[in-house]
Design a protein with these regions (language model features):
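Gram-negative bacterial Sec-dependent N-terminal signal peptides
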Residues: 4-22
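Flexible loop/hinge segments at secondary-structure junctions
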Residues: 23-260
């Protein structure tokens, strides 16, 4: 599926950093003038990070490295979705707000109203959204229009019918009549919003989608539910699931669900 730029938001009393999301064709280039970090003195206290679950692993890695430089600084990480970041940053209960989507205009306005300046964006990494099925599922490829018809009751991509069974996607035998079990993120998630905008064309998710609090929960659900399908970052893949190759439309090239 399409790639998104994942951003970390760092908004404090002095420095404001906001999230951003954009389509990307490849990883961002490192600034050649960027100098190695130099440790300073007098850094201590507590740092709270509240925001995207998709960035939990990255935030943990950064926190561990930061603590090696500054053992007297304690970093607490809470990942419950990108939508939890702006309120926490505005309220001052968090100094870091990782987000996997762009800040909304209303969120920026609320921040500016309190602090007197707009948040600044720091782009940190690129993530790719993938569609996962159980490792035993033999599906070879899906189009974006089919994925929309599976997850959305609006079907704005224009597929010919609502898709509720695996047989409608071409599977035979024991799979043909089996209902498709749907797993996705909750509305606080930037991943939820990105999929809704780009895959569903801002249509509505089906009421049967089992909304999960985190990316790992989606993958775990698909792992234990043989007839399930779910969406998450490709980096969340485990041995229990398989990323489905995706094509933009029928007859187009199917692309593997990998970081490339």
């Amino acid at each position: 599926m399409r790639k998104k730029t994942v951003c970390a938001a760092v908004l404090a009393a002095v420095v404001a950093v906001g999230g951003s999301l954009a389509l990307a064709s490849g990883p961002p280039k490192l600034d050649p003038t960027l100098q190695p970090y130099k440790q300073t003195s007098g850094v201590s206290g507590n740092i709270n990070s509240i925001g995207s679950d998709s960035l939990n692993n990255v935030m943990t890695l950064w926190a561990e490295t930061f603590s090696k430089f500054y053992p007297n600084a304690k970093v607490q990480i809470e990942g419950k979705g990108s939508s939890t970041a702006p309120p926490a940053l505005i309220a001052g209960t968090a100094q870091l707000g990782p987000m996997s989507r762009a800040m909304k205009g209303t969120e920026i306005d609320q921040f500016e109203k309190k602090y007197g300046y707009k948040p600044t964006q720091i782009r940190t990494s690129v993530d790719a959204l993938g569609v996962f099925v159980n490792k035993d599922n033999p599906i070879k490829c899906l189009t974006i229009t089919q994925v929309d018809a599976v997850f959305s009751k609006s079907r704005r991509q224009g597929y010919k019918e609502d898709v509720t069974t695996w047989g409608q996607l071409g599977l035979t035998g024991e799979w043909a009549a089996k209902p498709i079990s749907l797993y996705g993120r909750n509305s606080a998630s930037g991943t939820y919003g990105f999929s809704k905008e780009h895959t569903l064309k801002n249509g509505d998710y089906k009421d049967t989608v089992k909304e999960q609090p985190g990316s790992a929960s989606v993958v775990q659900g698909v792992t234990v539910d043989r007839f399930a399908i779910g969406y998450s970052g490709v980096g969340d893949s485990t041995a229990g699931v398989r990323g489905v190759p995706l094509a933009e439309k029928e007859g187009a090239t199917c692309y593997e669900a990998d970081p490339d």
